[in-house]
């Protein structure tokens, strides 16, 4: 009904995958995973609105893969029943979530890693995921934790250092190795083609979402592909030039 974009990102060599925003149609997701012989290493939600987490518990039960959200959205997830009532739909199954990501963490599967960028505004715990191919900092597990950053380091400076590949030696939270081609940004409901996420729902903030986009997402190269939570793909360059909310 709500037509959320669910992303399945697989490594064709290792057959490992990450699933982002399983809002519904879990059987269809499982069918695609079986068709491509993919093993889910992690399930990530960019935020916990019901259209992005409606299938979370069922997919976790079927795959046993760890579920990751930003802790600032946990309270919103705990009120799925109220979200469902507001939309006039059934309450989906829920689960206990105890594993959280934060700014600078990297979720890994196969030869790929997704850098967590905290982009509050649509919700307090909204995140975007910068996906690149490269060797991550450790050989075991699915999550590299970010090293604590100096208090004065700006988010933009940290992102630019990461993109240059000089964010330090192989430390938790870094993605090492050259990227192959432009990065891919799974943006959730923060940035859309020609628009931005709603800020009139619980926890929303127009100031925060504009800061998230301008200070963090627009620090990425123009050729970065943006996969939004709804609608068509776009690029950072296209939104920098054409998005009316960013002028």
Where are these regions (language model features)?
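Conserved beta-strand positions that form and line the central face of beta-propeller blades
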Residues: 8, 19, 76, 100, ...
């Amino acid at each position: 009904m709500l037509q959320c974009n669910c992303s399945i990102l697989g490594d064709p060599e290792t057959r490992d995958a990450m699933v982002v925003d399983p809002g519904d149609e879990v059987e269809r997701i499982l069918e695609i995973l079986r068709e491509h012989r993919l093993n889910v290493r992690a399930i990530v939600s960019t935020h916990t609105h019901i259209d992005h987490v409606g299938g979370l518990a069922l997919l976790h039960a079927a795959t046993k893969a760890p579920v990751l959200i930003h802790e600032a959205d946990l309270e919103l997830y705990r009120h799925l029943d109220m979200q469902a009532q507001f939309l006039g739909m059934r309450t989906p199954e829920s689960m206990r979530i105890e594993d959280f990501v934060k700014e600078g963490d990297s979720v890994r599967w196969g030869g790929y890693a997704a850098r967590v960028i905290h982009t509050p505004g649509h919700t307090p715990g909204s995140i975007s995921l910068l996906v690149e191919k490269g060797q991550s900092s450790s050989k075991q597990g699915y999550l590299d934790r970010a090293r604590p950053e100096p208090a004065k380091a700006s988010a933009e400076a940290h992102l630019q250092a990461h993109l240059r590949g000089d964010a330090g030696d192989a430390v938790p939270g870094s993605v090492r190795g050259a990227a192959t081609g432009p990065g891919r940004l799974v943006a959730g409901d923060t940035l859309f083609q020609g628009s931005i996420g709603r800020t009139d729902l619980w926890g929303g903030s127009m100031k925060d979402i504009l800061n998230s986009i301008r200070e963090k997402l627009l620090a990425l190269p123009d050729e970065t592909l943006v996969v939004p939570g709804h609608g068509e793909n776009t690029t950072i360059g296209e939104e920098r030039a054409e998005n009316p909310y960013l002028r």
